[in-house]
């Protein structure tokens, strides 16, 4: 089986991802030794958090670290759209030196380059970004600027995400030969086995698809890896 180099583990992909369960991480650990960075996001919505939410996420980091997480994916913003470095300190301390990725809060921050530099100052080794756009192709110019910062100033790797597939990896690699890290859900939808369905009684947001389960597609992962290695 051709696997990814690293796994970002999260729950609730339909809302952009939330903190996963330690039990799920432990199950993964029994089956694979792939490095796992866990997303830490206690709720859906924006990335400005209360002190109680920060305390909760620091506790989630400690719990997941004890369950086998090798790194964490975190991020907080101030109301003005800057990286909230002060609020992130408790989470960074809870990680106890584990590698850190800044998640896509950068894409809704006021200044992507400033946010990248702030992440560098905090010790992050990776920044996940779509270039401040709804998908990576639309954010290509901004991603190019961030890759330039990485190469000229040294600092966090640029992990390109949002809409990544094998075709786009090849496209990015042609335009930016230095693009070397890509983040993809590589998901497919599995039809629910439920025969009796009540479409008029949603369990979540109205209109949310509740009759499919998202699952990683092995062939998509393989094609992405092949495109990266070309």
Tell where the protein language model's regions lie, with residue ranges:
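Catalytic domains of carbohydrate-active enzymes, especially glycoside hydrolases
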Residues: 1-14, 67-68
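Hydrophobic faces of well-ordered beta-strands that scaffold small-molecule active sites
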Residues: 7-9, 36-40, 72-74, 100-104, ...
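Active-site-adjacent beta->alpha loops and helix N-cap segments on the catalytic face
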Residues: 13-34, 51-56, 76-96, 109-115, ...
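Catalytic cores of alpha/beta
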Residues: 1-2, 46-63, 107-122, 143-154, ...
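Ordered, amphipathic secondary-structure segments that act as subunit-interaction surfaces
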Residues: 59-75
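A structural motif
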Residues: 4, 33, 68-69, 124, ...
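C-terminal alpha-helical cap/extension of soluble enzyme domains
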Residues: 68, 150, 154-230
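Ligand/cofactor pocket segment of small-molecule handling proteins
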Residues: 95, 99, 105-107, 117, ...
């Amino acid at each position: 089986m051709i696997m990814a180099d690293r796994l970002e583990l999260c729950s609730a992909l339909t809302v952009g991802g939330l903190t996963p369960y330690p039990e799920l991480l432990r199950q993964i650990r029994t089956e694979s030794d792939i490095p796992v960075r866990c997303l830490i996001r206690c709720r859906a919505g924006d990335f400005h958090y209360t002190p109680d939410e920060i305390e909760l996420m620091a506790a989630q980091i400690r719990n997941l670290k004890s369950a086998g997480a090798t790194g964490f994916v975190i991020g907080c913003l101030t109301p003005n759209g800057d990286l909230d470095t002060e609020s992130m300190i408790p989470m960074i301390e809870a990680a106890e030196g584990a590698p850190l990725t800044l998640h896509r809060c950068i894409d809704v921050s006021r200044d992507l380059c400033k946010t990248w530099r702030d992440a560098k100052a905090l010790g992050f080794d990776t920044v996940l970004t779509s270039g401040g756009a709804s998908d990576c192709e639309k954010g290509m110019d901004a991603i190019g600027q961030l890759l330039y910062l990485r190469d000229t100033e040294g600092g966090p790797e640029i992990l390109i995400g949002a809409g990544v597939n094998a075709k786009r990896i090849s496209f990015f690699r042609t335009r930016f030969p230095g693009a070397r890290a890509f983040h993809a859900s590589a998901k497919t939808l599995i039809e629910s086995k439920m025969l009796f369905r009540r479409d008029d009684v949603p369990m979540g947001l109205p209109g949310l698809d509740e009759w499919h389960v998202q699952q990683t597609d092995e062939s998509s992962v393989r094609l992405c890896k092949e495109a990266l290695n070309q």
